[in-house]
């Protein structure tokens, strides 16, 4: 009996050690750039803010990574962190998807909101989390966006929302679609209050998010190479039966056609935001 007990502990310890070694190997593996196929050391990519050093392809950031990149150290104060979705329409498998998304992303929902400062400039911030069901907009995402806007109005401070989304969350049906009108309405009040709203579009920003709050800002910024649009290019091509222009729906194309105001490299993001906030508040 004693022998068996020791054997189990030894096996458990060995198993944990092997798992740890496997995790370390995964972390150390080089990453292939999806744009230029360059092999990049994971540490080098992290040091370069997850931007390919050869072709400048911008890899996705988690919401927490983007917050750390943009705001002053220890200035972020999250609010509404306890809000999370539930299966209000009894959609098959939705509850399991929510639980899995929370586990994988470490976030309770598809957006994180809070108060922060950028070089001392106070603002309300919302950052979408692509790791949570592709940051699709359901009832809770819409509610958190609205509460962030209302908080900015109450404090009379600027609002910054960083978008990346696959669109409305299909598992919530019309409730998800209603969030487009809901967020647009509260932003209309924000605009009437004369306050500054900056929108940062990252890869990808599509569907109901691109057709609502992401496109209603006073200043619209975008990261290079981001896919931005309502329907995807393949759907549009099949619908109209024509070849699409090169780089169609990419941020560079939208800049050329007056749909966004400025392309911002990730390394310049905080400085650019600081300048815009300084001009507005100064």
Curated annotation (Swiss-Prot):
Q: Which family does it belong to?
A: Belongs to the AccD/PCCB family.
Q: Any idea what job this protein has?
A: Component of the acetyl coenzyme A carboxylase (ACC) complex. Biotin carboxylase (BC) catalyzes the carboxylation of biotin on its carrier protein (BCCP) and then the CO(2) group is transferred by the transcarboxylase to acetyl-CoA to form malonyl-CoA.
Query: Where in the cell is the protein located?
Result: Cytoplasm
Q: How does it assemble?
A: Acetyl-CoA carboxylase is a heterohexamer composed of biotin carboxyl carrier protein (AccB), biotin carboxylase (AccC) and two subunits each of ACCase subunit alpha (AccA) and ACCase subunit beta (AccD).
Q: What is this protein called in UniProt?
A: Acetyl-coenzyme A carboxylase carboxyl transferase subunit beta
State which gene encodes it.
accD
- Identify the residues that the record assigns to the CoA carboxyltransferase N-terminal domain, covering every copy: 29-282
Domain of life according to the entry: Bacteria
Q: Which leading EC class covers this enzyme?
A: transferase
Annotated membrane-spanning segments are none
How are cofactors bound according to the entry's free-text note? Binds 1 zinc ion per subunit.
């Amino acid at each position: 009996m004693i022998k068996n007990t020791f054997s189990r502990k030894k096996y458990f310890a060995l198993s944990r050690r092997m798992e740890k070694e496997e995790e370390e190997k995964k972390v150390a593996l080089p990453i292939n750039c999806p744009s230029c196929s360059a092999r990049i050391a994971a540490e080098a990519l992290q040091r370069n803010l997850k931007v390919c050093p050869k072709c400048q392809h911008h890899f996705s950031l988690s919401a927490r990574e983007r917050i750390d990149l943009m705001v002053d150290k220890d200035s972020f104060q999250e609010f509404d962190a306890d809000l999370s979705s539930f299966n209000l329409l009894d959609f098959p498998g939705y509850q399991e998807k929510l639980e899995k998304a929370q586990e994988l992303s470490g976030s309770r929902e598809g957006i994180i909101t809070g108060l922060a400062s950028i070089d001392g400039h106070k603002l309300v911030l919302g950052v979408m989390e692509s790791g949570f069901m592709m940051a699709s907009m359901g009832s809770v995402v819409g509610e958190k966006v609205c509460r962030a806007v209302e908080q900015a109005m109450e404090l009379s401070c600027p609002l910054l929302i960083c978008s990346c989304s696959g669109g409305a969350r299909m598992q919530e049906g019309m409730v998800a679609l209603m969030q487009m009108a809901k967020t647009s309405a509260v932003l209309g009040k924000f605009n009437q209050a004369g306050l500054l709203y900056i929108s940062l579009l990252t890869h990808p920003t599509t569907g109901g998010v691109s057709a609502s709050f992401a496109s209603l800002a006073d200043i619209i910024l975008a990261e290079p190479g981001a896919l931005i649009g309502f329907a995807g290019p393949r759907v549009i091509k099949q619908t109209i039966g024509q070849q699409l222009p090169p780089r169609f729906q990419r941020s560079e194309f939208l800049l050329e056609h007056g749909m966004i105001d400025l392309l911002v490299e990730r390394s310049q993001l905080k400085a650019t935001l600081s300048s815009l906030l300084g001009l507005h508040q100064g």
